[in-house]
Regions:
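Conserved beta-strand signature within the Rossmann-like core of class I S-adenosyl-L-methionine
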Residues: 143-150
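N-terminal, positively charged/glycine-rich alpha-helical extensions of SAM-dependent methyltransferases
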Residues: 1-18
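C-terminal alpha-helical "lid/dimerization" subdomain adjacent to the S-adenosyl-L-methionine
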Residues: 151-199, 205-207
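Conserved alpha-helix/loop element of class I SAM-dependent methyltransferases that forms part
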Residues: 25-44
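Core SAM-dependent methyltransferase catalytic element
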Residues: 202-222
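A short glycine-rich, Lys/Arg-flanked "PGG" loop and its adjoining helix->strand segment in the class I
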Residues: 131-142
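Class I SAM-dependent methyltransferase SAM/SAH-binding core
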Residues: 48, 56-106
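A conserved beta-strand element that flanks and buttresses the S-adenosyl-L-methionine
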Residues: 118
Length: 222
């Protein structure tokens, strides 16, 4: 199946509300678990989540690791609003968590570099994937941990629809539509490997970790 682009920014309030209200606890918790398994002992320093959406992974990382500073970057103001509303009630995280509105490349970040750069479900939104792979070495310090999880494109439209019904059959139609569009906009694992080689990141590992997710992990040179 050929890739079908989708909008890069979820800037409609209803779309953001549907996404923020959906149950992504299982994949988001799995993302945090992948981070902890790939980088055992990583409990201090600064982490940035690129394309953080409503901030669930940002908040999970900060809750699990009290010595971490965690920043979330997204270009959707409605999405960030839902994250900020949750943070407002989490007094123990305030001062360690910050949400930033901005777009890659060139976003104005609170820190010059980060000890870890993570991203979940941003890659498939990007019309030009090199935006992500160029930004990670610019944002992460030498030797920084890198963890990117995203959907991968199924072999056919029928397979994509089956995945939607399996994992989001009970969700609102708006969310099911967006999920299908995201699957169709995602990259195949080998396409991601080609992207990494083109940006000097061929040492990063690419693996499939579910029936719909791929994982890129490793450290920046240095």
């Amino acid at each position: 199946m050929q890739r079908i682009l989708e909008p890069e920014i979820m800037d409609e309030f209803e779309q953001a509300r549907a996404y923020a209200g959906a149950d992504f606890a299982e994949p988001n918790e799995r993302f945090v678990s992948h981070f902890e398994k790939k980088f055992p002992g990583f409990g201090h320093g600064a982490v940035i989540d690129l394309g953080c959406g409503p901030g669930d992974i940002v908040l999970r990382l900060a809750q699990r690791h009290p010595a971490l500073t965690v920043h979330g970057l997204d270009d959707s103001r409605p999405m960030l609003g839902f994250g900020a509303a949750r943070l407002w009630d989490m007094h123990e995280l305030q001062g360690r968590v910050q949400f930033i509105e901005g777009i890659l490349p060139g976003a104005q970040l609170p820190l010059l570099c980060y000890d870890a750069v993570v991203s979940n479900s941003l890659l498939h939104h990007l019309h030009d994937p090199s935006v992500l792979w160029r930004s990670i070495p610019e944002i992460g310090r030498p030797g920084a941990a890198v963890l990117v999880m995203d959907l991968f494109r199924p072999v056919s439209a029928a397979a994509a629809r089956e995945i939607v019904e399996t994992h989001a059959g009970g969700e609102p139609e708006l969310l099911k539509r967006d999920f299908l569009n995201s699957l169709c906009a995602a990259f195949e694992p080998e396409e991601v490997r080609v992207q990494l080689r083109a940006h000097g990141l061929a040492h990063l590992e690419v693996e499939t970790v579910s029936d719909r997710h791929l994982l890129v992990s490793g450290r920046l040179p240095g």
